[in-house]
């Protein structure tokens, strides 16, 4: 379990040191009004406490990704720990910080609009199409995945759960951000964290064996090579471009620029820890 605990510690230290470095490089000015204050409209631009925003952002970017991906990526052995840790610190955390930072600095606009601002109208149109197609695919997974899980836990048909979840998504989309998302998402986000803590506790106190990171070649015959398969199997939990579509939603609710690091970089680190726990659990059972 040494590798597992070391990975978690490195992630936390990475947030404290490298996250602070990233913040200093991009520059934070707390004297400036954020879009949540300057453009407050009671719908999308609603000031909220940063801790609540953190839980919402965490749930927005985490979901099923760091669970399913980490479980599948565990097949590559403890090398998955390295990718999750260094991917989160140097790639995913920076990506999420920057996507939230740029949106906040540009009146809370979406990822496609940001592309238009910096790369031109043609690039914006490409990004709009690209985002819509991929978000539809992600949305399908985020509907059918939970529906399938709920079907196994209840006697209610999967199709019924699909309708219920889809209706909930529509409500969360059309209502002001503080009415559904601001009230329910923090609860779900906290539940996701507690679930991971419970799994970690089970691994520790039940004495499950988690493989250690060594110089051993786990796949000497070339099967399941980590290049490139590990890096596309574990995306959420290391780095995911999907997060750029979610960060602007919360950039419109941040009250002070000093909250950018804990909300965006911090939620990515939290997702990395979730991925580590699920990867460790999968390795213990594999």
PLM regions and their residue ranges:
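Helix-loop-helix module between adjacent transmembrane segments
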Residues: 11, 15, 91-107, 111-175, ...
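Selective recognition of specific alpha-helical transmembrane segments in multi-pass small-molecule
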Residues: 7-19, 131, 135-139, 189-206, ...
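Membrane-embedded alpha-helical segments of transport systems
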Residues: 59-66, 83-95, 129-140, 266-278
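Hydrophobic alpha-helical segments and their helix-loop junctions in multi-pass secondary transporters
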Residues: 139, 143, 147-161, 173, ...
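Hydrophobic, membrane-embedded alpha-helices of multi-pass small-molecule transporters
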Residues: 48-65, 202-208, 217-281
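Extracellular loop-to-transmembrane helix junctions
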Residues: 1-19, 73-103, 112
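Membrane-interface "cap" regions at the ends of multi-pass membrane proteins
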Residues: 10-67, 256-259
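Juxtamembrane helix-boundary/capping and inter-helix hinge elements in multi-pass membrane proteins
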Residues: 73-79, 104-110, 117-122, 251-261
């Amino acid at each position: 379990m040494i590798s597992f605990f070391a990975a978690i510690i490195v992630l936390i230290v990475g947030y404290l040191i490298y996250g602070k470095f990233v913040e200093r490089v991009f520059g934070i000015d707390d004297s400036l009004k954020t879009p949540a204050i300057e453009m407050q409209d009671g719908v999308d631009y609603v000031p909220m406490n940063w801790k609540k925003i953190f839980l919402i952002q965490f749930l927005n970017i985490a979901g099923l990704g760091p669970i399913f991906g980490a479980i599948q990526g565990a097949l590559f052995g403890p090398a998955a720990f390295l990718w999750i840790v260094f991917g989160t610190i140097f790639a995913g955390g920076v990506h999420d910080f920057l996507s939230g930072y740029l949106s906040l600095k540009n009146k809370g606009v979406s990822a496609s609009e940001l592309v238009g601002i910096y790369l031109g109208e043609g690039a914006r149109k490409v990004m709009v199409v690209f985002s819509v197609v991929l978000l539809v695919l992600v949305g399908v997974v985020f509907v059918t995945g939970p529906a399938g899980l709920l079907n196994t836990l209840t006697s209610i048909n999967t199709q019924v759960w699909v309708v219920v979840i889809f209706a909930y998504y529509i409500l969360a989309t059309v209502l002001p951000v503080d009415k559904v998302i601001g009230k329910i998402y923090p609860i779900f986000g906290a539940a996701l964290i507690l679930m991971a803590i419970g799994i970690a506790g089970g691994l520790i106190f039940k004495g499950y064996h988690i493989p250690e990171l060594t110089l051993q070649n786990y796949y000497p015959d070339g099967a399941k090579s980590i290049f490139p398969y590990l890096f596309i199997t574990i995306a959420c939990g290391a780095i995911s471009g999907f997060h750029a579509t979610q960060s602007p939603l919360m950039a419109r609710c941040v009250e002070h620029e000093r909250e950018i690091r804990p909300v965006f970089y911090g939620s990515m680190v939290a997702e990395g820890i979730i991925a580590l726990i699920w990867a460790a659990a999968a390795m213990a059972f594999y």
